[in-house]
From Swiss-Prot:
GO cellular component entries: plasma membrane
Gene transcribed to yield this protein: htpX
Cofactor, how bound (note): Binds 1 zinc ion per subunit.
Organism, scientific name: Rhizobium etli (strain ATCC 51251 / DSM 11541 / JCM 21823 / NBRC 15573 / CFN 42)
Protein name, UniProt field: Protease HtpX homolog
InterPro entries reported in the protein's UniProt record: HtpX_protease, Pept_M48_protease_HtpX, Peptidase_M48
């Protein structure tokens, strides 16, 4: 189903590029736009995960510089029956995390320094289990490509303005009015592409994540802390790249509060309630607790991401 959804997104992006090309340069512009869109789609499939990680200046970590965090992800991946993903850390005081990659064999999980500082090891395990669930459900392909394409769509309005805004452009079949329409429609289309990613995937990933880590309450507690942190601590990189907001476990943008048609995430309280109900039902989970997560084990420090040459503040694992 995710492959079909991804194909539909790619087709929509191509059609939108062709439409704007038609507004700017008629049939010739439409053909040029088609070639550009085809190239972007090919590039996005193979490189969109790298682009997202680069946008947040994430640094890959291993068991040498982040042994406790790396061990948590390793044991969770084993519980889920997944290949070991690459593990990244990005420097942000806002607690949050995301997963990316076109398939389980080429996947990565990323957490903020703020996440490791604010959450206990058990809560971090719940968050990482959620992200691994996205990888296992193959949500990451759709999520990553959507982030890249939505960002490109939002640029189409500016493209039309600079290259098609000439009132005397005889190649533009709809004239200046058509360009103005494109400037309005393109950002709206970017939002609709993000809305095309069903919010039910978050509930599914929450449930599967609870099964992977072995305790729904770990993730429930983490969601509450992350939501409170995201509401008060800005993520400047996310504000500059709003098309990636739907990739995070909690929306990183300011002003995201309501569980409605225009939200990229379900309401956090609803997600927590579902996890608490799962725990109260006594439902047997498919895997046991992660062996690496033990309240008596403490990490030495939050790893240095290498940004600015400064060591992030030490967190509760210290």
């Amino acid at each position: 189903m995710n492959l079909v959804r991804t194909a539909m997104l790619l087709a929509f992006m191509t059609a939108l590029f062709m439409f704007v090309g038609f507004l700017i340069g008629g049939r010739g512009g439409m053909m040029i736009a088609f070639l550009i869109a085809a190239g972007m789609n090919f590039f996005s499939y193979w490189n969109s995960d790298r682009m997202v990680l680069a946008a947040y200046r994430a640094h890959e970590i291993d068991e040498r510089n982040a042994p406790e965090f790396f061990a948590i992800v390793r044991d969770l991946a084993r519980n889920a029956g997944l290949p070991m993903p690459k593990v990244y850390l990005y420097d942000s005081p806002q607690p949050n995390a995301f997963a990316t990659g076109r398939n389980p064999e080429n996947a990565a999980v990323a957490a903020s320094t703020g996440l490791l500082q604010a959450l206990s090891p058990e809560e971090v395990a719940g968050v990482m289990a959620h992200e691994l669930a996205h990888i296992q459900n193959r949500d990451t392909l759709t999520m990553t490509i959507t982030a890249t394409l939505a960002g490109a769509i939002s640029m189409l309005g500016n493209f039309a303005f600079f290259f098609g805004g000439n009132r005397d452009n005889n190649n533009n079949p709809l004239g200046f009015v058509g360009v103005l329409v494109a400037m309005i429609v393109a950002p709206l289309a970017a939002m609709l592409v993000q809305m095309a990613i069903s919010r039910t995937r978050e509930y599914s990933a929450d449930r599967r994540g609870a099964e992977i880590c072995g305790n729904p309450l770990w993730l429930a507690s983490a969601l509450g802390k992350i939501a409170r942190g995201a509401a008060h601590v800005p993520n400047e990189d996310a504000e500059r790249n709003p098309a990636t907001a739907h990739m995070f476990i909690i929306n990183p943008l300011s002003g995201e509060r309501m569980d409605n048609l225009f939200s990229t995430h379900p309401d956090t309280e609803n997600r927590i309630a579902a996890l608490q109900e799962m725990a109260q039902s006594g439902m047997n989970v498919s895997t046991g607790p992660v062996r690496a997560v033990n309240p008596t084990r403490k990490s030495r420090s939050v790893p240095n991401t290498g940004r600015g040459g400064s060591q992030p503040p030490r967190g509760p694992w210290s």
